C-alpha cells in the first residue's frame, strides 16, 4: 500500500478546520479530523476506537501491537479561533515559506499527528513486544473534555505517555494548574446623595479584593517550588466592571481573577483557601456575593524527576527536563501513567497569527519519536 507522504498528512490536518470555542458561533467539533486520523491509523495496521463524548466532539484511540504496558502518544485535535485580518497566510491551508509550515494548528498541535504517522512508517514493527497507543482528543482549548473523559474511563494501562504540545523538543515534566472564577456582588442602587438608601457593590468588592490580595501574599510566603521560574502560586485580578454613573450608587460589580497553583496544591485545597479568605466578607454581606467558575479548573502536574521516562527522554533529546507555567492535558493523563510533554514547535507560536512550525524541527522530531517507540515498544 502506498501511504501518504509526511507533507500530505500535514496538509490535510491543517486544511480540515476543527476549532473549539466557548462561543457557539465558532465551535465546530473535530469529527472530520478524527475520521481522517482513523483511516490513516487503520492503513498502518492499527486497531482504532472512536468515541463521541458530546455531539461532534470525538476522541480517537489507536493501538498498534499487543501486550501490556507500552507507550501512549497523545495530543488534541482542536484549535483556537483566529482573527483572519491579522493573518498574512491562509489559516486553513499549509503554506511553505521562510523554511516554515504556516497554518492554524501547525504547532499547536494537529501537526504532531503527522510526525507520529511518519515515525510509524519508518519502523520495522516485526519484533514489537509492547503496544503503541495514539490518543487524539477533543476540546483541549476550552474544557479539556476529551482528556478528562479518557482518563476517567479508559481501560488501557500504558507504561508511559508523551503529549506532543509545542515545547521546542524540550521535555517538560511539570506545570502549574489554572483556576479562574468570577465574583459577582449584588448591591442596591440609588442616588449618591443618600448612601443610606443603597448598598454599594463597589465598596463590597473593595473588601473582597483586599481579602484576595491577602491570600495572594500568603500563597507567595507559604508555597515554593524551585523547579519553576516563578516558584510560587500566582493570583491575578484580571478584569472588573461595575457601576454606570458617578452620581449613582453601584448596584452590581463583577471581578474575574485567576490562580495558578503549583503541583501538589489540590483543587479542593485551593478552593478551601479561597473560601476561607472571603468568609468574613460573605458573613458581613450575606446573599450578596456569588462565585462561579469561568472554566473547569485544571490541577497542577508533576512527573517525578526520578521516573525512568524522565531520564531516558532527556537522554534521547539531549535536553534538560524543564517545567513551564502554561497548562496542558498532562494532569489528567498523569493519572494513568508517568507523563511528559514533548513536541515540535515553539509555545510562542501557539494562539498567534501566522502560526508556524520551522522546518528545522521536522527531522529531529521524527528521530526522537522513533527512538521513543523503539525504547518503549520493543
UniProtKB/Swiss-Prot annotation:
UniProt-listed NCBIfam families: AcOrn-deacetyl, PRK05111.1
Purpose of the protein: Catalyzes the hydrolysis of the amide bond of N(2)-acetylated L-amino acids. Cleaves the acetyl group from N-acetyl-L-ornithine to form L-ornithine, an intermediate in L-arginine biosynthesis pathway, and a branchpoint in the synthesis of polyamines.
Location of this chain's protein in the cell: Cytoplasm
Reaction equation(s) it catalyzes: N(2)-acetyl-L-ornithine + H2O = L-ornithine + acetate
Gene name per UniProt: argE
Entry's EC annotation: 3.5.1.16
Coiled-coil positions: none
Family annotation (Pfam families): M20_dimer, Peptidase_M20
Predominant location category: cytoplasm
Residues noted as binding Zn(2+) 2 in the record, renumbered to the chain: 108, 141, 351
Protein name, as recorded: Acetylornithine deacetylase
Family: Belongs to the peptidase M20A family. ArgE subfamily.
Record key words, sorted: Amino-acid biosynthesis, Arginine biosynthesis, Cobalt, Cytoplasm, Hydrolase, Metal-binding, Zinc
A single GO molecular function term of this UniProt record: acetylornithine deacetylase activity
Swiss-Prot/TrEMBL cofactor(s): Zn(2+); Co(2+); glutathione
Record pathway: Amino-acid biosynthesis; L-arginine biosynthesis; L-ornithine from N(2)-acetyl-L-ornithine (linear): step 1/1
InterPro entries: AcOrn-deacetyl, ArgE/DapE_CS, Bact_exopeptidase_dim_dom, Peptidase_M20, Peptidase_M20_dimer, Peptidase_M20A
Organism annotation: Aliivibrio fischeri (strain MJ11) (Vibrio fischeri)
Phylogenetic lineage: Bacteria, Pseudomonadati, Pseudomonadota, Gammaproteobacteria, Vibrionales
Highest taxon of the lineage: Bacteria
SUPFAM superfamilies tied to this protein: Bacterial exopeptidase dimerisation domain, Zn-dependent exopeptidases
Amino acid at each position: 500500500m502506498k501511504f501518504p507522504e509526511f507533507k500530505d498528512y500535514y496538509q490535510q490536518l491543517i486544511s480540515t478546520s476543527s476549532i473549539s470555542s466557548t462561543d457557539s458561533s465558532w465551535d465546530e467539533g473535530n469529527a472530520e479530523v478524527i475520521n481522517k486520523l482513523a483511516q490513516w491509523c487503520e492503513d498502518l495496521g492499527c486497531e482504532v476506537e472512536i468515541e463521541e463524548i458530546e455531539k461532534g466532539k470525538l476522541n480517537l484511540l489507536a493501538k498498534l501491537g499487543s501486550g501490556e504496558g507500552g507507550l501512549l502518544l497523545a495530543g488534541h485535535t482542536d484549535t483556537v479561533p483566529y482573527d483572519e485580518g491579522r493573518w498574512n497566510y491562509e489559516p486553513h491551508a499549509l503554506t511553505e515559506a521562510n523554511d516554515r509550515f504556516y497554518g492554524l494548528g501547525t504547532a499547536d498541535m494537529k501537526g504532531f499527528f503527522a510526525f507520529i504517522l511518519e515515525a510509524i512508517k519508518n519502523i520495522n514493527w516485526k519484533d514489537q513486544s509492547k503496544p503503541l497507543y495514539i490518543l487524539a482528543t477533543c476540546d483541549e482549548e476550552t474544557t479539556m473534555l476529551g482528556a478528562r473523559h479518557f482518563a476517567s474511563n479508559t481501560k488501557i494501562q500504558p507504561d508511559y505517555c508523551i503529549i506532543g504540545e509545542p515545547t521546542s523538543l524540550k521535555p517538560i515534566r511539570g506545570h502549574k494548574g489554572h483556576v479562574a472564577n468570577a465574583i459577582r456582588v449584588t448591591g442596591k442602587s440609588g442616588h449618591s446623595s443618600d448612601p443610606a438608601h443603597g448598598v454599594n457593590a463597589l465598596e463590597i468588592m473593595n473588601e473582597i479584593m483586599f481579602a484576595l490580595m491577602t491570600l495572594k501574599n500568603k500563597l507567595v510566603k507559604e508555597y515554593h517550588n524551585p523547579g519553576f521560574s516563578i516558584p510560587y502560586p500566582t493570583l491575578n485580578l484580571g478584569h472588573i466592571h461595575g457601576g454606570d454613573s458617578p452620581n449613582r450608587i453601584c448596584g452590581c460589580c463583577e471581578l474575574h481573577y485567576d490562580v495558578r497553583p503549583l503541583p501538589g496544591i489540590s483543587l479542593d485545597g485551593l478552593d478551601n483557601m479561597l473560601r476561607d479568605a472571603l468568609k468574613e466578607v460573605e458573613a458581613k454581606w450575606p446573599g450578596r456575593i456569588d462565585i462561579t467558575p469561568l472554566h473547569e479548573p485544571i490541577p497542577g502536574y508533576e512527573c517525578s524527576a526520578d521516573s525512568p521516562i524522565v531520564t531516558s527522554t532527556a537522554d534521547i533529546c539531549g535536553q534538560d527536563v524543564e517545567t513551564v507555567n502554561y497548562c496542558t492535558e498532562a494532569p489528567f493523563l498523569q493519572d494513568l501513567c508517568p507523563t511528559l510533554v514533548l513536541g515540535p514547535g515553539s509555545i510562542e507560536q501557539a494562539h498567534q497569527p501566522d502560526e508556524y512550525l520551522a522546518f528545522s524541527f521536522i527531522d529531529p522530531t521524527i528521530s526522537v519519536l522513533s527512538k521513543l517507540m523503539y525504547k518503549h515498544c520493543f
